[in-house]
Amino acid sequence: MKYNEIMPECFIDTTLVASVLDAKVSHKHSCNEVAREMEKGKYKDAFAVGIIDNDKRKISYIESFDEIGRTDNLTFLKHRDKHHYVIKVGKEHKAMETFIKSNVDAIGMKMEDFDLPSDLAELIEQTKDSVSTQKDPKILKLCKAMRQSPEVAKLQDVLAYLAANKYNVDIDELKKMIEAR
């Protein structure tokens, strides 16, 4: 299965989301590319979900979104007028790798269990901007194991709900999914 309208930025985000959904998604190279595709591109007037790092870069298009919920490491946003959703991953001003480390800890494992560095800078260096990340057996094993994490399971549920309901999303139902423990 392929979800073209689900657009993660960077390779580790794409690898995790594809693993969680057990499907292909539409990789974008940056948060700006995700926003541009939603605001002016193919999905301008269509359903779309962007998945971006919650980093320091401010994207003007995101100012048209309202927060509909959050977890420790995920912020869920909905466009005021369109069927556009954005999920910011990680704590504020942090990259996806902080989300990964947090959720690996949540399932009682360590990065070393996947033969990956526990040092954040080293992990970022290993996972950033590399097509090989999507085929790396260590990364794939990590992403599969992370499905056990309650927060990753919530991400999976929200993405599956959005993909199944595209133009018929019940915001109250979505908020309940996000708030559920």
Predicted features by range, described:
Residues 1-181:
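Acidic, divalent-metal-binding catalytic cores of TOPRIM
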